[in-house]
């Protein structure tokens, strides 16, 4: 597996990140792998590398490039403390729906320019805060994104006029949403409303509550990491990508 640091040009600046390229000489489907709120680090690099080993070219962008380069938190993270809340706001506020749409095209176009990427369909996966970003990217580039996955994604349904689920009519991808059974950012009531939106949409989807999982369960360096449920989530994600993109998992 080849890991390359990359600079991704966007209309709003340059996003740093990594590209994971299989040693195979044939072009492979591209996947955009979005990190959780903690950004690009050893854990997320390992997750992206593992996915690439399934037979894909994977782009791991620093989605918070407008604010800072890694690490996202240069102090102990405690979401009950003001400085953590302030940093969270600094990282997320620039990611407006319009900014995410611009980034979507930048990431897709970057992958398309890579010789290791085929000219066809792509996928996207997001975790935590970026679960909603994965949905927004699928809506922004329905011409390319045929598979989207989200794990412990927060705020997929809100009462705001910019709620991510309102974009479902724009999405042509098959989607998988994995929810935690205990998640303040996506409580049971919000999951129920989100499932109603998915059913009304009429596309091909999976929306599952991982019964033994808390928010952050898929990420190896998370305090909530649950190996068994993380492996279940990984199997569901790779099955989605195998159905839609091929890869060695097919």
Regions found by a protein language model. Give the residues of each.
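N-terminal cap/leader regions of alpha/beta-hydrolase-fold enzymes
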Residues: 1-250
